[in-house]
From Swiss-Prot:
Bifunctional glycosyltransferase that can produce both C- and O-glycosidated flavonoids. Converts 2-hydroxynaringenin to isovitexin. Converts eriodictyol to orientin and isoorientin. Converts naringenin and eriodictyol to naringenin 7-O-glucoside and eriodictyol 7-O-glucoside, respectively. This is UDP-glycosyltransferase 708A6. GO terms for molecular function: flavanone 7-O-beta-glucosyltransferase activity; UDP-glucosyltransferase activity. Expressed in radicles, hypocotyls and juvenile leaves. Expressed at low levels in roots. Gene3D superfamilies: Glycogen Phosphorylase B. It is an enzyme of class 2 (transferase). It comes from the Eukaryota.
């Protein structure tokens, strides 16, 4: 059936996945590929762009295609030439988004050769992938790689801008966004880039938001009990002017996948030597670096808390560029002072392994969506410290759902001032010493487990999507 091998048969629908750049986007696509191939009887091809922006992306793709073959295959998606100087100083991941978007016409021959039953595109590429799929009669679905709340904003934001334009409010900036049927997203929580109408990300976000109503369906890595208001509003279509919206498939939390057995990492050996629920795990994701002065305040706060901690430090946007000296980053003597009760690394870690470990009692997180769904899956309390993008929208969910707490006054990218060591230490002590925090997070974990169980809402939702792919295969 597919051009890259003879194992794909008409008995199994063939789903082509089109991820975009960044681990926050690629990880859920890898998990979806395995879930579809191993749990729901699909053949899967992943349109992979090389080279990747980061080393972590390259490692993940290599592991996926080795371990999940032959049910999961690579489709080499070669990009058209792209002049990055058109967007001086732009984020390297946003540049890759744009380069991939402009190469969308090249996706057509891949779909033709693969004889795809369906295309699942990243939301970042939706507005350019949808016409290509439509031309070929291939059903086009979107995998939304953030929360249902953020999907609501994406779907509603074009109408919000249109209403402002009609009222003559162009140029006054984005304010509070009241999404019908959902809730208010305060101005301070709207992703920073969306306040600039000329920003590359804003242009992509609006174009993709406008096209959502034309897609065949939207998969979201969340579960009904985690975001009941947003999921209900999306399914009822109350967030759109027309009152219509495609089917929404809540398929999360998509579970992490270990592709191969490896030697136990040194950070895991360290974790195993710590008492139950005694360790604070600190990670701000793979996408952004914290400014050095704030990094040192965080270091001092962790030290002052007196708690054990495992900290993954990042100093650059792209991991290939991360050559900083750890001791120099965190201040003279810090590593020596916390030796024994802390493990600090700049290396890549398997976060899902850490969050599953019984010694972890708190997760200080930037609120990237993959991180939050992993914390929810394992019932680990979260201290939310959003830094940019969708992360304040996600942090609000941490507080609403009972997964943890969000100190709304703590600074994020572009804001003046520092979150002090005293604030950090106080919050850590409070959350680590309060049993109700762990109990509420554990309830979220129970709800997540129920959702992905065979009769659960997320399992059934993914099966409904697969059945649509089977039906398309028969036509």
């Amino acid at each position: 059936m597919a051009a890259n091998g003879g194992d794909h048969t008409s008995a199994r629908p063939h789903v082509v996945l089109l991820p975009s750049a960044g681990m926050g986007h690629l990880v859920p696509f890898a998990r979806l590929a395995v879930a579809l191939s191993e749990g729901h009887g699909c053949n899967v091809s992943v349109a992979a762009v090389q080279p990747t922006v980061s080393s972590a992306e390259s490692r993940l793709l290599d592991a996926l295609f080795v371990a999940a073959a032959p049910a999961v295959r690579r489709l080499d998606f070669r990009l058209a030439p792209f002049d990055e100087s058109e967007f001086p100083g732009a984020d390297p991941f946003f540049l890759r988004f744009e380069a991939t978007r402009r190469s969308a016409p090249l996706l057509g021959p891949l779909l033709d050769a693969a004889e795809a039953s369906a295309l699942v595109t990243d939301i970042v590429l939706a507005s350019v992938a949808l016409p290509v799929a439509r031309e070929r009669g291939v059903p086009c679905y979107v995998l939304f790689t953030s929360s249902a709340a953020m999907l609501s904003l994406c779907a509603y934001f074009p109408a919000y801008l249109d209403a402002h334009a009609a009222a003559g409010s162009v140029g006054v900036g984005v304010g509070n966004v009241d999404i019908p049927g959902v809730f208010r997203i305060p101005k301070s929580s709207v992703p920073q880039a969306l306040h600039d109408p000329d920003h590359l990300f804003t242009q992509q976000f609006v174009a993709n938001g406008r096209c959502l109503v034309a897609c065949d369906g939207i998969l979201v890595n969340t579960f009904d009990a985690f975001e009941p208001d947003a999921v209900t509003a999306l399914r009822q279509g109350s967030i759109t002017v027309s009152g219509g919206f495609p089917p929404v498939f809540t398929v999360g939390p998509m579970l992490p996948v270990r592709f191969q057995a490896e030697e136990t990492a040194d950070y895991m050996r360290w974790l195993s030597a710590q008492p139950p629920r005694s360790v604070v795990y600190v990670s701000f994701g793979s996408r952004k670096a914290i400014p050095r002065d704030q990094l040192r305040e965080l270091a001092a706060g962790l030290e002052a808390s007196g708690k054990r901690f495992l900290w993954v430090v990042k100093s650059t946007i792209v991991d290939r560029d991360d050559t900083a000296d750890l001791g120099g980053l965190l201040g003279d003597g810090f590593l020596e002072r916390v030796q024994g009760r802390a493990f600090v690394t700049m290396g890549w870690v398997e976060q899902e392994e850490i969050l599953q470990h019984g010694s972890v009692g708190l997760f200080i997180s930037h609120c990237g969506w993959n991180s939050l769904t992993e914390a929810a899956a394992f019932g680990v309390p979260v201290l939310a410290w959003p830094r940019f993008g969708d992360q304040r929208v996600n942090a609000a969910l941490v507080a609403r759902s009972g997964l943890g707490a969000w100190e709304e006054g703590w600074t994020w990218d572009g804001e003046e001032g520092l979150t002090t060591r005293k604030e950090v230490a106080k919050k850590i002590k409070g959350m680590m010493g309060y049993d109700a925090v762990a109990e509420k997070a554990a309830k979220v974990g129970d709800a997540a487990a129920a959702a992905i169980a065979k009769c659960g809402t997320s399992y059934q939702s993914l099966e409904e999507f697969v059945q649509r792919c089977r039906d398309a295969e028969r036509k």
